[in-house]
């Protein structure tokens, strides 16, 4: 890892799995600035990478739980921009592309609109539309299925439409972050991690695919060489 101590305006972070390991990567829109090998993503392991980097003004990420905890603990003043594309993928996975319910179809359409939000006014409108969706479908997503519990005198329950409810909860958590970051005061602030996904992770996956016969240790060294080649120091 190459550390320069430079304070960056925007940092994009994400993780990529290589066999039994995960490579946590931090970069700007131009350069890789740090990486860390860990067994899995958690607040502890994300902290190992984040704590050695100066806090930026903005950070763009996919909102993984452990990552968020590390960010809010170590970079409390940094403005968080969650990746909307990840939100879209997660909601699409929960609802599918062809939801059976009206609530699901409307929520999927609302998630598509999220990708086109660029300004605070648009964000406020989107937030109000999400609020209206909940008012209209709250009884549906809060519906419970109750079934007998083997323990006498008790009953168990679960949300009947838990996938739709889970998709809504994800968008609900995103709404305030959307307002903070929709008006981008600086052109270097991206709305998603595509700089990392396409510019770094995609070539890494191709690199590993072309060297599948290597041991994981050799693959890791190959990845580190590639990441170093994308640092500012290597490009000087």
Question: Which role fits each region the language model picked out?
Answer:
Residues 35, 87, 212-213:
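A generic structural signal for short coil/turn motifs at secondary-structure boundaries
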Residues 62-65, 69-111:
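Conserved beta-strand -> loop -> alpha-helix junction used to position metal-binding or nucleic-acid-contacting
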Residues 22, 70, 94, 205-206:
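Short, function-defining helix-loop hinge/capping sites that tune catalysis or transport
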Residues 58-61, 68, 109-236:
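Acidic/histidine-rich catalytic cores and adjacent linkers
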